[in-house]
Curated annotation (Swiss-Prot):
Keyword tRNA processing: no
Keyword Flavoprotein recorded: no
Subunit note: Component of the TIM23 complex, at least composed of TIM23, TIM17, TIM50 and TIM21. The complex interacts with the TIM44 component of the PAM complex.
Residue ranges annotated as Mitochondrial matrix topological domain: 33-58, 109-112
Organism: Saccharomyces cerevisiae (strain ATCC 204508 / S288c)
Variant or mutagenesis effect after changing residue 118 to S: Does not affect oxidation state
One of the protein's GO biological processes: protein import into mitochondrial matrix
Cysteine pairings via disulfide bonds: 10-77
Annotated protein name in UniProt: Mitochondrial import inner membrane translocase subunit TIM17
Consequence when changing residue 120 to S: Does not affect oxidation state
GO molecular function: protein transmembrane transporter activity
Similarity comment: family membership: Belongs to the Tim17/Tim22/Tim23 family.
Length: 158
């Protein structure tokens, strides 16, 4: 079985996913904590309250997203290397390991519940992705041209 050379090697994919997840978390954190800081500040200080909330919390949220994305990508590459196939089960298994690894400090019960929850979440995401792929393939299915009408047996009138 030959390796798939159309994709970047796993270390580059891991760094790319970490950076993308960090950016998503940071942008989402700017929006979320900006609104939250604006609403929780007194009337004359709403702008500065929003900015201080953004500066304090948005990088933290970006880092949390980045850790999740990098860890998921690491486990995804590891599962692909072990299973030697590319299918939706890789993401589900990687989600299971990611949820467990992030929750391991909370004890056995928390680790188990987070692993199962993360695997279920990734299962739903993969299922929706497969559903959209099948729908797009069905939309692109070639259709036969319409059949011409059968000639009528009535003579033409002049």
């Amino acid at each position: 079985m030959s390796a798939d050379h159309s994709r970047d090697p796993c270390p580059i994919v891991i760094l790319n996913d970490f950076g993308g997840a960090f950016a998503m978390g940071a942008i989402g954190g700017v929006v979320w904590h900006g609104i939250k800081g604006f609403r929780n500040s007194p009337l004359g200080e709403r702008g500065s309250g929003a900015m201080s909330a953004i500066k304090a919390r948005a990088p933290v949220l970006g880092g949390n997203f980045g850790v999740w994305g990098g860890l998921f990508s690491t486990f995804d590459c590891a599962v692909k290397a072990v299973r030697k196939r590319e299918d939706p089960w890789n993401a589900i298994i990687a989600g299971f390991f990611t949820g467990g690894a992030l929750a391991v400090r909370g004890g056995w019960r928390h680790t188990r519940n987070s692993s199962i929850t993360c695997a279920c979440l990734l299962g739903v995401i993969e299922g929706v992705g497969l559903m959209f792929q099948r729908y797009a393939a069905w939309q692109a299915k070639p259709m036969a041209p319409p059949l011409p009408e059968a000639p009528s047996s009535q003579p033409l009138q002049a």
